[in-house]
Amino acid sequence: MTLLNVSDLSHHYAHGGFSGKHQHQAVLNNVSLTLKSGETVALLGRSGCGKSTLARLLIGLESPSQGNISWRGEPLAKLNRAQRKAFRRDIQMVFQDSISAVNPRKTVREILREPMRHLLSLKKSEQLARASEMLKAVDLDDSVLDKRPPQLSGGQLQRVCLARALAVEPKLLILDEAVSNLDLVLQAGVIRLLKKLQQQFGTACLFITHDLRLVERFCQRVMVMDNGQIVETQAVGDKLTFSSDAGRVLQNAVLPAFPVRRRTSEKV
């Protein structure tokens, strides 16, 4: 089942010039893509190529300058009030900057309950039980419930944001560099959790990342973005090889997992 369909999407930002006239800075250019239920797709690209802007458009935080975004066959621009509420529940995003994504005055308990209060019909006791369950799933315990964001480490706060997104059991989870910054042990645990959700609920995942190792471990498809365009789409197999210049640059930039000893025939 197709969850998200994007066709001929372009976007620009207007800013004033010295002459007083508005100038347009193109960020996305004729982007098209499809995401299906239960699949895991990576959007790979260097910083500043338009990945995060595309994500903001996909979840409805901004409207595109041109093109169409459809959710389950319905254009986002034409969703009625009830459909928009369901859309906000079904598609969740975890941002790279977790500090800006939460209210620093709220406790973790309040942060986790917020989407459940607005998007789900759960009693308070059920909300609290699910909050505790989601914390456990991201390797945190109830001791953080009464803490506020400034009292948490960056990794802890990132996991709180992930738990908040998972609490409403979304159909599509977009992670904007949200897993790449975790250590390898936590990253592996989060990936196991996401695989479980995919099996249980058919949750689709879109990883926005520059981490090629994450792509190879978890994703089924990868799209390479460069200068606001998707320049290549590849299935992820045993040996991932890119044909685009942008893809090859990213692949060549990956460091080996362990230091490689150079061979030499010279004797010291």
From Swiss-Prot:
Binding locations of ATP: 45-52
Keyword annotations from UniProtKB, A to Z: ATP-binding, Cell inner membrane, Cell membrane, Ion transport, Membrane, Nickel, Nickel transport, Nucleotide-binding, Translocase, Transport
GO MF annotation list: ABC-type nickel transporter activity; ATP binding; ATP hydrolysis activity; nickel cation binding
Top class in the EC scheme: translocase
Membrane topology of the entry: Peripheral membrane protein
E.C. number: 7.2.2.11
Cellular-component GO terms for this entry: plasma membrane
Domain ABC transporter per the UniProt entry, residue ranges: 4-252
Gene3D superfamilies membership: P-loop containing nucleotide triphosphate hydrolases (3.40.50.300)
SUPFAM superfamilies given in the database record: P-loop containing nucleoside triphosphate hydrolases
InterPro entries found in the cross-reference section: AAA+_ATPase, ABC_transp_ATP-bind, ABC_transporter-like_ATP-bd, ABC_transporter-like_CS, Nickel_NikE, P-loop_NTPase
Localization terms from the record: Cell inner membrane
One Pfam family per UniProt: ABC_tran
Keyword Ion transport (UniProt): yes
SMART domains according to UniProt: AAA
Record field: catalytic activity: Ni(2+)(out) + ATP + H2O = Ni(2+)(in) + ADP + phosphate + H(+)
Chief place of localization: membrane
Function: Part of the ABC transporter complex NikABCDE involved in nickel import. Responsible for energy coupling to the transport system.
Family as reported in the entry's similarity comment: Belongs to the ABC transporter superfamily. Nickel importer (TC 3.A.1.5.3) family.
Assembly notes: The complex is composed of two ATP-binding proteins (NikD and NikE), two transmembrane proteins (NikB and NikC) and a solute-binding protein (NikA).
Family matches, as NCBIfam families: nickel_nikE (TIGR02769), PRK10419.1 (NF007739)
Protein name: Nickel import ATP-binding protein NikE
Organism listed in the record: Shigella dysenteriae serotype 1 (strain Sd197)
